[in-house]
A protein has these predicted regions:
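Short, amphipathic alpha-helical segments that act as regulatory/interfacial helices
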Residues: 89-93, 112, 116-119, 156, ...
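Short amphipathic alpha-helical interaction segments
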Residues: 179, 342-351
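Sensor-1/coupling segment of RecA-like P-loop NTPase cores
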Residues: 160-170, 174-183, 187-217
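A short, basic N-terminal segment
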Residues: 1-43, 107
Length: 351
């Protein structure tokens, strides 16, 4: 069929043609957002899950919803190599300059001064261009947790003064170091205590709840950590059929069953298989034969890109561990079983 009309979009954080199976979480987020703007903030949301399940797509949807409600939004991908403080300051500068338009606001001017103080303590000794004076004694202690709390409190007050709010959408949150994570949690805790319209949504890998709990013991009371995983059979079928039906293309039932079985409802695989099967098919309906024709291309694409990129980053010990898991078959697996496969003690099995 016409490759130009192919509705499927495999990629990193690429919005799928049909965002299916996440309605409950999106609704929960929108309620939390509206409550925060109304001065009744509650728990912030941190979706967690493996790569390819759609966490970044959800963050982008949350971004869209916040904009629709006329909130200010900063979208950050946490850097692996540090520099989060500068990145946060740069994004908040843009927000405050937006809020500074129109009638003079004491709260906004104060927030700009506190941001100036915050940037004066950047690790490399540089600052971000702001045509205001720093406010002494605010966000200038050099203690990241206190300074970040001062800054987000001031920005929250500035947003409230403009009848707005702030959404911080933070992707790859597990890359924050312990000090950065503790500082951010501390800052959100303070804005909640002061009923300020500040909401944090942070997506990360499954280890994020443990990292957050280690950083601040009250993290589990401040955030919800919904698990984002594979889709059920009905939702997986909808991911395939909704965008194709919009183009007048159908699947045979056995083809749908085959694709749902092959992908196990894993969102990225649904997009990858859907993309290649569409290109392999000559006309509607898409059949089992089309899937068989597309299979080598899908396997090559996954092997050379999806899997290889991750495998290349593994240490030799991690590769051995991964190979042992693969030899055990579909998981999950207990650490004791993996240790037995590696012929080592449980306490020394983990890479």
């Amino acid at each position: 069929m016409d490759a130009f009309e192919n509705p499927f979009r495999p990629g990193a954080g690429t919005p799928p043609p049909a965002l299916v199976g996440r309605d409950e979480l999106i609704e929960k987020y929108e309620v939390a957002l509206r409550r925060a703007v109304a001065g009744r903030p509650g728990k912030s949301i941190m979706p967690i899950g493996l790569r390819g399940v759609g966490k970044t797509v959800l963050l982008n949807r949350f971004h869209e919803i916040a904009r629709r409600h006329e909130l200010k939004v900063i979208l950050i991908e946490a850097p692996e190599t540090g520099g989060f403080k500068r990145l946060l300051a740069t994004r908040l500068r843009s927000i405050l300059l937006e809020l500074d338009r129109g009638p003079v606001s004491v709260a906004v001017k104060r927030a700009l001064g506190i941001l100036k103080s915050f940037t004066c303590t950047l690790p490399d000794g540089t600052s971000i261009a702001l045509h205001v004076d720093a406010i002494a004694g605010q966000a200038d202690s050099g203690i990241l947790s206190e300074d970040t709390a001062d800054l987000l409190t001031a920005v929250g007050e500035a947003a409230r003064d403009r009848n707005s709010g702030l959404l911080i959408a933070l992707d790859e949150m597990q890359y924050l170091d312990a000090e950065e994570l503790a500082a951010l949690i501390r800052a959100i805790h303070r804005t909640v205590q002061l009923n300020l319209p500040v909401v944090l949504v942070g997506a990360g890998l499954p280890q994020l709840p443990g990292l957050a709990g280690n950083a601040k013991s009250y993290a589990e009371r401040l955030f919800d950590f919904p698990q984002i995983g594979s889709l059920g059979s009905a939702d997986a079928r909808a991911v395939l059929t909704l965008p194709t039906a919009a183009r007048g293309v159908a699947f045979t039932e056995d083809a749908l069953d085959e694709l749902v079985g092959i992908t196990r409802g894993y969102p990225y695989f649904l997009q990858e298989w859907g993309y290649h099967v569409w290109n392999a098919a000559s006309d509607s309906p898409i059949t089992l034969q089309d899937i068989r024709i597309a299979a080598p291309d899908v396997q090559q694409q996954l092997d050379e890109n999806f899997f290889l990129v991750r495998i290349d980053r593994l240490t030799p010990a991690e590769r051995k561990y991964l190979l042992a898991m693969a030899e055990l078959g579909p998981g999950p697996h207990r650490s004791g079983d993996i240790a037995a496969k590696l012929a080592v003690k449980v306490e020394s099995a983990a890479p």
